[in-house]
Amino acid sequence: MQIVLASQSPSRRKILNSAGVEPLIHPADVDEDALLHSLNGSAPEEIVRQLALAKAQVVAPSYPGDVVIGGDSMLLIDATLQGKPHTREATIERWKQQRGNKATLITGHAIIFGDEVIVESSSTNIHFAEASDVDIERYADSGEPLECAGAFTLEALGGWFIDSIEGDPSSVIGLSLPVVRRALYRLGFNASDFWNM
């Protein structure tokens, strides 16, 4: 038995690796834009939970004896939910909006084992630094934030521009270890059952 990560996110994989788990990676093929459109008007937490669930549900049938984890993160700032910026221009625009401000990173988790499905979200408050225009442009030029929810990373270059967080750091990076641990316990497992040691 193993943990299957229904994601191609290097950050989610690194979180599990640093916690002693070498997950099997099976990226989910989900039309996120269509799902987001169908969830229009839903609460932000529900949106990220449903995105995570869709990813896990696509992958789970291929791994009936394994624990499948789907995840999705988005940044809630000024009552607007933001995903990945994808472009340099969008990254710069977002950073000019979020610098010096506070926002909430919401991460949805879906953990499936057999017929059991656990869906939960975690929220962490982010206090963004007053980053200079030059630093914002250079950060965007690095390419690092283009495929990250909220256009930032906590664990790499983006860490320069985060003054503080309130909540779970692993959730900000993309997968809350406390949420996953609680889910494993509910499924009758120990976290250490999945350590590759």
Swiss-Prot record:
GO terms for cellular component: cytoplasm
Coiled-coil-forming residues are none
Q: Which reaction does it catalyse?
A: a ribonucleoside 5'-triphosphate + H2O = a ribonucleoside 5'-phosphate + diphosphate + H(+); a 2'-deoxyribonucleoside 5'-triphosphate + H2O = a 2'-deoxyribonucleoside 5'-phosphate + diphosphate + H(+)
Give the GO terms filed under biological process for this record.
Answer: nucleotide metabolic process
| Keywords assigned | Cytoplasm, Hydrolase, Nucleotide metabolism
Q: Which top-level group of life is the source organism from?
A: Bacteria
As for subcellular location, the record says: Cytoplasm
One GO molecular-function entry:
nucleoside triphosphate diphosphatase activity
Q: Which residues form the active site?
A: 72 (proton acceptor)
One of its Pfam families is Maf
Q: What is its EC number?
A: 3.6.1.9
**CDD domains, per the entry:** Maf (cd00555)
Q: What is its main location?
A: cytoplasm
Presence of the UniProt keyword Cytoplasm in the record: yes
The record's top EC class is hydrolase
Q: What does the record give as cofactor?
A: a divalent metal cation
Q: Does the keyword Amino-acid biosynthesis apply?
A: no
Function in brief = Nucleoside triphosphate pyrophosphatase. May have a dual role in cell division arrest and in preventing the incorporation of modified nucleotides into cellular nucleic acids.
Provide the family line.
Answer: Belongs to the Maf family.
Question: NCBIfam families from the xrefs?
Answer: maf
Q: What is this protein called?
A: Nucleoside triphosphate pyrophosphatase
